[in-house]
Amino acid sequence: MKRIALSTLSLALLGVTGVAHAQSSVTLYGLIDESIQYVHNTVDSAGQNKNLVAMFAGNLQGDRFGLKGTEDLGGGLKAIFQLENGFDVNSGKLGQGGRMFGRQAFVGLTGDQWGTVTLGRQYDPLVDLVQPLTADNYFGSTFTTPGDVDNNDNSSRTNNAIKYTSPVWGGFQFEGMYALGGVAGATGSGQTWSGAATYATGPFSVAAGYFRADNGNTLASRTAAGSVGWNGSTSDGTFDNQVNGAYAAAKSIGIASVALQYVAGPFTANLRYSNAQYKPDANSGFGSTEKYNIGGAYLGYQATPAMLVGVGYIYTKASGDSSATYHQVSLGGDYNLSKRTDIYLVGAYQHASGQQRTSAGTLVDAGAAIGSYSYNSASSSQEMVSLGIRHKF
C-alpha cells in the first residue's frame, strides 16, 4: 500500500511552554481484479442457452479504491474513518448501485482496551467474523452460495449502521450492529440488526452469528420506479439471479451462519452451515417463507509459498415456497507473482433440480446459476472458467 502521511504535527507555540502533538495518518489503497471468463449455458435476451466469452471484473475480490485514516487522540484512543469505492474496471462505472463510496463509508472511535465503535455504511458482523472461515475468503464468487442467498460473498452492505467490535480477549471476539430505519412513527421499519462471535486457538477457529433485515412496513416503502422489491431496507438486497430473484419483495430476511476452520501445515480445511429465510407478508407476492439450508466444505493446499490450490463444494436446498436443490463444485489456483500481484484460474460446475419460483410468480424447473454471478441457465447445469489477474496498491 502507498501511504500518504499526514504525519506527526509538532507545534511550538511562541510564548507558551510545552509542545502539542497529534499523530495522524491517511492511507490511499485499492485493488483491481480482472479476468477473461467462459460460461457454458447462460441465457441470451431470447431466453435461450448460449455460451459466453467475456471480460469480467471481481472474481476473487471486487475492484475498489479507498481512503482510510486514524488520528491519535491520546490515552489509547483514536479516531478512525474509511471511505471505499467500488467500480468496474471494464467500463469505469461505479458499483453498488452507482454510489460514490458504495463498499464502505464510516467514521468512529477505537481503543485497545474497550474496542471499536463505527457509524455509517458498513459490513455486518457475519461478513466480518464468519465469512473469513469459508471458501469464499480464499477464492471469491466462484466458491460461494448460488445467488448469494446467505450473503456469503458480501454482496450486501448496511446503511445507517452503528457497529461495536470488541478487542480480542484470549482468542475470543464479538461484534454487534444495529441500523436505524429512520422512518417517522415506525422505528422498526427498514431496520437491520446483527451479531456474531469468533474464537481462535492454535490451528482451530470457529465463528457464528445472526443477521436480520426488515424491508419496511408498507407497500410504498418497497416500491421504487414503479417496481415492488427490496427498496425499504437499510441493507442491500442480493437478488441478481434466478435462485432467489422471486423474493425481492420479502418482508424480512434472516440469516444464521456458523463456520469452523482447521489449519495443519500447508492444508486449510473449513466447513460451514447457513440457514437463510425470506419471510413474506401481504405485500410480498408470495405466500410461504422461502428457506435455504446451505452446507459448504473447502480444502486448500499451499503447494509453495507462492501457489495456493483449493477445492470447494456447496449444497443448497430450498424449501417452503419452492423445492430447488443445487450442487456446486469449484476448483481454483492462485499464484503470487509478487506481494501485490497474482494470477489465478478458477472454475465451477453446478447442477440444479426441483422447482424454483420466477419473478413472474410461477414455479418452473430449477435452472443452474453458479455462485453470486448473474448468469442464469435455462437448463439444470452450468459450467464456468475464469483466468485472471489481481493487483493491489
Regions found by a protein language model. Give the residues of each.
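Transmembrane beta-barrel outer-membrane domains
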Residues: Q48, F56-G62, G98-G102, D153-R157, ...
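Extracellular loop and loop/strand-boundary signature of outer-membrane beta-barrel proteins
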Residues: K50-V53, K93, D148-V149, G181-G182, ...
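Hydrophobic, lipid-facing positions within transmembrane beta-strands of outer-membrane proteins
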Residues: Q61-F65, R103-V107, T158-I162, W193-G195, ...
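Detector for outer-membrane/organellar transmembrane beta-barrel domains
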Residues: A196-G332, A348
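Outer-membrane beta-barrel "beta-signal"
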Residues: S379-F393
